[in-house]
Amino acid sequence: MGKVAVGLSGGVDSSVTAGILHRQGYTVEGVTLWLMKGKGQCCSEGMVDAADICEQLGIPHHIVDSRDLFQKYIVDYVVSGYEVGVTPLPCSQCNRMVKFGPMLQWAKAELGIDQIATGHYARIRYNDQTGRYELLRAVDRHKDQSYFLYDLTQEMLAGTLFPLGEMTKGETRQIAAEMQLSTAKKPESQDLCLIEAHGSMKTFLDKYIEQREGEIVDLDGKVLGHHTGIHHYTIGQRKGLGIAAPEPLYVVKLDNVMNRVVVSTRDRAGQSECTVQRMNWLALPGITSPIRAEVQVRYRSGAVPVTVIPLEGDRLKLVFEEPQFGITPGQAAVLYDGDRVLGGGIIEHPEAA
């Protein structure tokens, strides 16, 4: 069947991925990326569990020191975004810059293996007509992770397997139990690795960003309260504002220049359009005229109809069929045609338009 390097985090999904491929006859080598400097759950407990799985399956286990990459492309990226009122999406950045690309390069250079596999819930297929690899949603829509994978390149898709893409999470757990894997009953991680390692995003950010007090204002500029730093907030946030108001208020803008958090009632917070930068096309080589598609602007939000208008360079304008709430600069806007990912990019500040 050939050789494959499986990315092992120490969780049940990557464990089952290794188990399935091993059972299918692949020569499997486990690879765990050492991501964080200092102590953290994702680096200690996960490494131990990954090593246990490799021992159980009888396959080699390699630990790759990726701490400098993680610091540069994730920690610094997240901090610099929050400093200027942007809410970055570290998972998509990590997949491209820390995990898939570097792991493919390492596996080829160190192991002579040109194919990797991970426990992500998504699917990959090759389109003979277009000559392009396509990324599709997972069969298990609730677990689908295609939103975080939009930024992979054609080369990365060509060298990657997603064995869990056709399965449900329940089936994954069942296979883990049947194989008697040591991670079969391990609880699922609910947070970003940064949060798991530091307790909360606030704790993590406060290590790097100075708390700077400012005003919380409404859309008319009326002062409603005060904050201890705009990096403590994100667009669409309702809880933790510390404001007494007759109606629920939501964060609608983070003004880095004035150091203000702007809030509004939900009915005044909709956006009819936004612009996107750093567009990465997957199913298409790009567009030269407007197209209709669906767009997902947050991981847990549904895809909604949109008109996609090309701008200069790697930028697009998205015009929504209906105004959308919580359009967040720094998050991804991922375009879909049914289950197929057309591509995606990063939402810009409204001022950039």
From Swiss-Prot:
Annotated family: Belongs to the MnmA/TRMU family.
Enzyme superclass (EC): transferase
Interaction with tRNA, as annotated region: 143-145, 298-299
Pfam family, one: tRNA_Me_trans
Subcellular location: Cytoplasm
Annotated catalytic residues: C94, C193
EC nos: 2.8.1.13
GO biological process: tRNA wobble position uridine thiolation
Site features described as Interaction with tRNA, chain residue numbers: H120, Q331
Reported function: Catalyzes the 2-thiolation of uridine at the wobble position (U34) of tRNA, leading to the formation of s(2)U34.
Annotated gene: mnmA
Name listed for the protein in its UniProt record: tRNA-specific 2-thiouridylase MnmA
GO cellular-component term (any): cytoplasm
Catalyses which reaction(s): S-sulfanyl-L-cysteinyl-[protein] + uridine(34) in tRNA + AH2 + ATP = 2-thiouridine(34) in tRNA + L-cysteinyl-[protein] + A + AMP + diphosphate + H(+)
Sequence positions that bind ATP: G7, L8, S9, G10, G11, V12, D13, S14, L33, G119
Location (main, coarse): cytoplasm
Disulfide bond sites: C94-C193
Keyword annotations of the record: ATP-binding, Cytoplasm, Disulfide bond, Nucleotide-binding, RNA-binding, Transferase, tRNA processing, tRNA-binding
One Gene Ontology MF term: ATP binding
